[in-house]
C-alpha cells in the first residue's frame, strides 16, 4: 500500500465534498505536511486558487473573499504555528459571519507530545471560536469513504456562520507517484463523483417567524438603527424607514445613504437625545455599530421594545435591552414586515443633522484626514467598492461623511483589529473584480505590509490610501496620560511607504493638496493596477477636528 497515494485520495474526497457546498475559492500557503490537501485542491477544476506565503494574511484574504462571494472559502495550511496564524481571521469571521473552512494539516497522533518537529497540539487549539470543529483520523481504508464525505457534509450543514476547523493528520511519506492504492475505496462513492449534490443533504430552518404584532408597532413612534448589511439591504432599509416616517441612524457600513448624516455628531446634542426618548420602539437591523455617541445612546435608551434583526445568531446587543432577538436575513425580514406610510414624527433631529453637515462642509478645504473622511464620497470609483480600515479612519468616515445608498462598503468591524486589513481588502477585490478604494492608517498598513504582495496583480484598479498621522492617533481621543501617550500609546514610527511600494513594484504617490490627490486618482481609476497613495497629515489634526465639531454641534 502506498501511504502517499491514499493520503491524496482521502484529501480528494474532502476537497470534492467542499465543492458541493458552494466552495469555489481555496487559499493555500506553502507547506509539506499539507501536500495531500494542496495537490487535491490544485487538481480539482472547480476551484479558484489563491496563494500567499503568510498564513495570517492568507486567513484574512479568505475573509475578504467570503465577504463578497457570500460563500464559504477554504484555507489550506501546514502543521505547527502556521495553524495558529489563522486565529485572527477565524475570530473575525466568528463575529461577522463569513464562512471559512480551515483545513489544517497535522502530524499523526504518534508524533504529538513526543518532541517531533513542527508538531503541536492542533486539535481544539482554537477553543470556542470556530462555529464547528472536526478532528479527522489518520487516513485509513478501514474507514469507509461514505463516512468521510457524510461527516464533512454534516459539519457544513451545521455551519450557519463563522469558521469550520477541520484538522487533518497525515502520515509520511507525503510524496510519490499515484497508483491504484485506495481506488476501490474511492469508487465506492459511485456516481457521487459526477453529481453536484452533497452526499448527505440536511435542511435547517433559520428565518424568524413574522411578528404578529408588527401591525401594532409600525403605527408607533419608532427609530431605525442600521448596522452592517449588504448594499441591496441598505437601500431597502432606507426606503422602509422613510415610509414609516421613522428616523434612520445609519452606520458607515449600513449602505443606507445615511439620510441623517453626521449621526455621531448630532447624537452628542441633548436636544436630539431628548427627542429620541419619545421613541416607543427601536428596530436595529444589522450589528457592529461604530459611532461612540450612537453606542452611548443605545446603551441608555429605554423604549418599550428593542428589536435586533440579523442573520447572525447570538444576542448582538451589548446594552442587553428587553426586547426581541430575531435571526433572519434582513431583506427577508423586511418583506415579512412591510412598512405603513406615515408622517415623520421627528422634527429636531433632521434640523440638527443638516446643521451638523453644514459645519463639516465648512471645513472641507483644509488638507487633513478629517476632511479626507468627509470627501471620501467624491473619490469613490464608479461601479466600485470601498474598504474602510479600523481605528480613527472608520470613526471619522462614520461621523463626517455621507456614503451613497447601495454603494458596497466592507470592513472588519467584528473584533475591530488593525491586523490583516490589507489582506482582507485584497480578498474583497479578488472576489468582485471591481475597482476598489481602500483606506487605512499608517500603523494598520505597517501591521499587514506583507499583503502588498497580494496587490501586485489585480484585475481592476485598486487604490490604497494610507493616512499617515504618525502613530495610533485614536488614543488622542481617549483620556490617556499625556506624559506617557506618545511612547506607550501613539508609538509613532516616523516612516513613509515609498520604499515599501517600490519593493513590490506598486505605483506610489504622496499628494500634498486636494488637486494633486484628485489628479492621481483620475489616473489610477483608468489602469488595472495597484496605486499606493500616502497622505501625510499633521499628527493630531484629525482627532482635534472631530473634537471641535463635536463641541460645536453639541451647542446647536
UniProtKB/Swiss-Prot annotation:
Report the Pfam families cross-referenced here.
Answer: TPP_enzyme_C, TPP_enzyme_M_2, TPP_enzyme_N
Function statement: Catalyzes the thiamine diphosphate-dependent decarboxylation of 2-oxoglutarate and the subsequent addition of the resulting succinic semialdehyde-thiamine pyrophosphate anion to isochorismate to yield 2-succinyl-5-enolpyruvyl-6-hydroxy-3-cyclohexene-1-carboxylate (SEPHCHC).
The superkingdom listed in its UniProt entry is Bacteria
Q: Which Gene3D superfamilies does the UniProt record give?
A: 3.40.50.970, TPP-binding domain (3.40.50.1220)
Keywords associated with the record: Magnesium, Manganese, Menaquinone biosynthesis, Metal-binding, Thiamine pyrophosphate, Transferase
Q: Subunit structure, briefly? A: Homodimer.
Taxonomic placement: Bacteria, Pseudomonadati, Pseudomonadota, Gammaproteobacteria, Enterobacterales
Q: Give the EC number(s) under which this enzyme is classified.
A: 2.2.1.9
| Bound cofactor: record note | Binds 1 thiamine pyrophosphate per subunit.
Cysteine pairs bridged by disulfides in the record: none
Coiled coil regions, renumbered to chain: none
The enzyme class is transferase
What's this protein's name?
A: 2-succinyl-5-enolpyruvyl-6-hydroxy-3-cyclohexene-1-carboxylate synthase
List the GO molecular function terms: 2-succinyl-5-enolpyruvyl-6-hydroxy-3-cyclohexene-1-carboxylic-acid synthase activity; magnesium ion binding; manganese ion binding; thiamine pyrophosphate binding
Pathway, per UniProt? Quinol/quinone metabolism; 1,4-dihydroxy-2-naphthoate biosynthesis; 1,4-dihydroxy-2-naphthoate from chorismate: step 2/7; Quinol/quinone metabolism; menaquinone biosynthesis
Q: Which organism is it from?
A: Salmonella agona (strain SL483)
**What family does the entry list?**
Belongs to the TPP enzyme family. MenD subfamily.
**GO terms (BP aspect):** menaquinone biosynthetic process
InterPro entries in the cross-refs:
MenaQ_synth_MenD (IPR004433), MenD_middle (IPR032264), THDP-binding (IPR029061), Thiamin_PyroP_enz_TPP-bd_dom (IPR012001), TPP_enzyme_TPP-bd (IPR011766)
According to its UniProt record, which reaction does this protein catalyse? isochorismate + 2-oxoglutarate + H(+) = 5-enolpyruvoyl-6-hydroxy-2-succinyl-cyclohex-3-ene-1-carboxylate + CO2
Amino acid at each position: 500500500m502506498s501511504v502517499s497515494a491514499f493520503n491524496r485520495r482521502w484529501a480528494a474526497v474532502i476537497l470534492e465534498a467542499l465543492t458541493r457546498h458552494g466552495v469555489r475559492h481555496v487559499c493555500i500557503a506553502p507547506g509539506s505536511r499539507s501536500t495531500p490537501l494542496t495537490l487535491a485542491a490544485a487538481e480539482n477544476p472547480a476551484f479558484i486558487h489563491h496563494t500567499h506565503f503568510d498564513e495570517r494574511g492568507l486567513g484574512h484574504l479568505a475573509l475578504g473573499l467570503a465577504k463578497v462571494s457570500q460563500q464559504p472559502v477554504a484555507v489550506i495550511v501546514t502543521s505547527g504555528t502556521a495553524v495558529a496564524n489563522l486565529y485572527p481571521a477565524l475570530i473575525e469571521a466568528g463575529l461577522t459571519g463569513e464562512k471559512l473552512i480551515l483545513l489544517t494539516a497535522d502530524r499523526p497522533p504518534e508524533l504529538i507530545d513526543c518532541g517531533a518537529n513542527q508538531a503541536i497540539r492542533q486539535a481544539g487549539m482554537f477553543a470556542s471560536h470556530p462555529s464547528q470543529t472536526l478532528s479527522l483520523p489518520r487516513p485509513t481504508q478501514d474507514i469507509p469513504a461514505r463516512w468521510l464525505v457524510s461527516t464533512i457534509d454534516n459539519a457544513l450543514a451545521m455551519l450557519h456562520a463563522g469558521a469550520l476547523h477541520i484538522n487533518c493528520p497525515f502520515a509520511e511519506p507525503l510524496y510519490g507517484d499515484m497508483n491504484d492504492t485506495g481506488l476501490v475505496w474511492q469508487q465506492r462513492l459511485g456516481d457521487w463523483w459526477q453529481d453536484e449534490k452533497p452526499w448527505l443533504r440536511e435542511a435547517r430552518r433559520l428565518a424568524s417567524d413574522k411578528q404578529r404584532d408588527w401591525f401594532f408597532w409600525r403605527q408607533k413612534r419608532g427609530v431605525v438603527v442600521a448596522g452592517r448589511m449588504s448594499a441591496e439591504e441598505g437601500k431597502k432599509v432606507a426606503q422602509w424607514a422613510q415610509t414609516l416616517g421613522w428616523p434612520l441612524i445609519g452606520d458607515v457600513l449600513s449602505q443606507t445613504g445615511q439620510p441623517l448624516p453626521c449621526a455621531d455628531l448630532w447624537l452628542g446634542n441633548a436636544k436630539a437625545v431628548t427627542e429620541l426618548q419619545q421613541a416607543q420602539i427601536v428596530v436595529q437591523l444589522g450589528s457592529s455599530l461604530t459611532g461612540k455617541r450612537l453606542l452611548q445612546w443605545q446603551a441608555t435608551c429605554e423604549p418599550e421594545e428593542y428589536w435586533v434583526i440579523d442573520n447572525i445568531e447570538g444576542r448582538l446587543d451589548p446594552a442587553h435591552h428587553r426586547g426581541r432577538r430575531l435571526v433572519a436575513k434582513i431583506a427577508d425580514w423586511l418583506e415579512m414586515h412591510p412598512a405603513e406610510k406615515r408622517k415623520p414624527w421627528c422634527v429636531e433631529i433632521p434640523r440638527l443633522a443638516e446643521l451638523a453637515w453644514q459645519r463639516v462642509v465648512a471645513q472641507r478645504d483644509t488638507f487633513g484626514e478629517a476632511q479626507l473622511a468627509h470627501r471620501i464620497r467624491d473619490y469613490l470609483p464608479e461601479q466600485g467598492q470601498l474598504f474602510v480600515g479600523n481605528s480613527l479612519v472608520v470613526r471619522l468616515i462614520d461621523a463626517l461623511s455621507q456614503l451613497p445608498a447601495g454603494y458596497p462598503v466592507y470592513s472588519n468591524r467584528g473584533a475591530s483589529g488593525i491586523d490583516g486589513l490589507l489582506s482582507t481588502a485584497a480578498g474583497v477585490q479578488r472576489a468582485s473584480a471591481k475597482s476598489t478604494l481602500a483606506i487605512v492608517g499608517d500603523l494598520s498598513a505597517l501591521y499587514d505590509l506583507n499583503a502588498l504582495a497580494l496587490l501586485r496583480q489585480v484585475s481592476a484598479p485598486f487604490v490604497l490610501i494610507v493616512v499617515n498621522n504618525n502613530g495610533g492617533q485614536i488614543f488622542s481621543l481617549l483620556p490617556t496620560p499625556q506624559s506617557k501617550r506618545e511612547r506607550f500609546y501613539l508609538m509613532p514610527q516616523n516612516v513613509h511607504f515609498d520604499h515599501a511600494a517600490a519593493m513590490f513594484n506598486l505605483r506610489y504617490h504622496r499628494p500634498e493638496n486636494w488637486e494633486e490627490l484628485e489628479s492621481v486618482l483620475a489616473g489610477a481609476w483608468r489602469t488595472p493596477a495597484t496605486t499606493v497613495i500616502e497622505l501625510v497629515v499633521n499628527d493630531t489634526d484629525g482627532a482635534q477636528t472631530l473634537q471641535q465639531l463635536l463641541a460645536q454641534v453639541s451647542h446647536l
